[in-house]
Amino acid sequence: MVVNTEVNIGVLKLNNPVLVASGTFGYGDECKEMVELHKLGGIVTKSLSLNPRIGNPPPRIVETTGGMLNSIGLANIGVKKFIQDKLPFLKSIGTSVIVNIAASSVDEYCLVLSLLEEQEGIDGYEINISCPNVKDGGLSFGTNLSITVEITKRLRSLTTKPLIIKLTPNVTKISDFARAASDEGADAVAVINTLVGLAVDIRTRKPKLSTITGGLSGPAIKPVALAKVYEIARSVKISIIGIGGIMTAEDAIEFMLVGASAVQVGTANFIDPSTAVKVADGIVLYCTQNKIDSVQKLTGAMQY
């Protein structure tokens, strides 16, 4: 049996439902010798801001039980250098390219997106309003409902390409934020970004990260992420991209069963950059074994 692996995120058709998450795969060219990039459902780029950012001082990555803490601070090359140095390669790889945008003001989000709109080869945008690692951005946007509305509304007016709002789990009711994004024209939400976490070195009695707290990712957060996807799926009609601790095809299928149309592999890329391809292959195998002719039929198919 031939399994149809295509899924839709707004008007964007993905080859398969497995993308690589922002910040875990660079801009694609870093992994070209290790991964057959055309087999990915898509690449979500490292976050881009208007100007280059050096990020937070080290240490900014710490391994934890079942996961990883990071406090990178949105270090990136800036949008103009991305257009000049990275976008030409991304245009050539034969899979969808989604650019992740981060900013410290609503106007900056709009300016970055406007610059990207002038370029060919970009299939959609993921808007990072939820990064907990930067003191002057991220968290304040992602936990404020009215600002979420404003960002989505203004960016929607600037593009007809798929607009994906990446939500933080560090709020009381995440479905309110998903509904706000949906009401203002977002095509999808990406759920979840990292949880806030902290680790301490008991020998020095100092925090293990220079910024004290950071973003927790990896298998430890998967049950939380699944619950958030499930909550949102019961509240909105737009697509959901599930993120959080996906290491295997089984993990990805869980996200789809509770309502995700697609998934992103993140932390696992640091262990094995080809994880996303293996996850996509595993989803096809599961569908074949269960006589399911389209991966789209997995979305929301959890039995009660």
Please tell me what each predicted stretch does.
Residues 23-24, 244-246:
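Active-site metal-binding loops of divalent metal-dependent hydrolases
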Residues 1-97, 102-103:
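N-terminal capping/small domains of soluble enzymes
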Residues 55-65, 200-214, 256, 268-293:
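C-terminal helical cap(s) of enzyme catalytic domains, especially alpha/beta-barrels
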Residues 246-250, 272, 304:
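Small/polar glycine-rich anion-binding or flexible loop at a beta-alpha turn
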Residues 33, 37, 104-241, 247-254, ...:
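Alpha/beta enzyme core
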